[in-house]
Amino acid sequence: MMTRLETLKNNLQATLGQDIALTEALGELTLEVPADQWLTVCNKLRTDAGLRFESCIDLCGMDYQTWGDGSHANAHDEPARPGRFAVVIHLLSIEHNWRLRVRTYAVDEEFPIVASLIECWPGVNWYEREAFDLYGIVFEGHPDLRRILTDYGFIGHPFRKDFPLSGTVEMRYDPEQKRVIYQPVTIDPREITPRIVRESSYGMGR
């Protein structure tokens, strides 16, 4: 008798083809989708009777610029990431009671673009705005793609790995101008804790 995870895997292969990039780890399935097929595949995931992922419960951006640098990740011989910026969604099928993680990578690192999924799941509207605000990922087809967390005049995207930890500008009230102004950040970066790279077997009971 097949497990629920095996049934989901078979249904995904039946709908999307046997050659889909599907990985299983820790009792979860992750589907990798090329950026140019992102919207098409997600529509199938939502509408196909054997899948029926009616709900997108989360969407986030990722920046893999420093992935594996000085960590134990390389010890596991993980393949190189196909791009710097990725979009990850977590889907829920209420009808079949199963979940799926889906990921796509933006092709252009300088100007990352991914199709908006509002057509599939209208509830991702603010999730996509958040990923745009924090990572600079542009969601093509989004009806109102503007910042949602940072200030209107904010420059840059604070969750990118190359964004300075102390920021670039700060706000203060200027008593002479009697208004809030921006000025270059006055905080001096200070590292007081050495970076520790743990051995590859750390936390694995070995």
UniProtKB/Swiss-Prot annotation:
GO MF terms, alphabetically ordered: NADH dehydrogenase (ubiquinone) activity; NADH:ubiquinone reductase (non-electrogenic) activity; quinone binding
Catalytic activities: a quinone + NADH + 5 H(+)(in) = a quinol + NAD(+) + 4 H(+)(out)
Subcellular location: Cell inner membrane
InterPro entries, sorted: NADH_DH_suC, NADH_quin_OxRdtase_su_C/D-like, NADH_UbQ_OxRdtase_30kDa_su, NADH_UbQ_OxRdtase_CS
Origin: domain of life: Bacteria
A GO-annotated cellular component: plasma membrane
EC number: 7.1.1.-
Alphabetical keyword list: Cell inner membrane, Cell membrane, Membrane, NAD, Quinone, Translocase, Transport, Ubiquinone
One Pfam family it belongs to: Complex1_30kDa
Main location as per UniProt: membrane
SUPFAM superfamilies according to UniProt: Nqo5-like
Membrane topology of the entry: Peripheral membrane protein
Similarity section: Belongs to the complex I 30 kDa subunit family.
Chain's role: NDH-1 shuttles electrons from NADH, via FMN and iron-sulfur (Fe-S) centers, to quinones in the respiratory chain. The immediate electron acceptor for the enzyme in this species is believed to be ubiquinone. Couples the redox reaction to proton translocation (for every two electrons transferred, four hydrogen ions are translocated across the cytoplasmic membrane), and thus conserves the redox energy in a proton gradient.
Complexes and interactors: NDH-1 is composed of 14 different subunits. Subunits NuoB, C, D, E, F, and G constitute the peripheral sector of the complex.
Identification of the protein by name: NADH-quinone oxidoreductase subunit C
Organism expressing this protein natively: Bordetella avium (strain 197N)
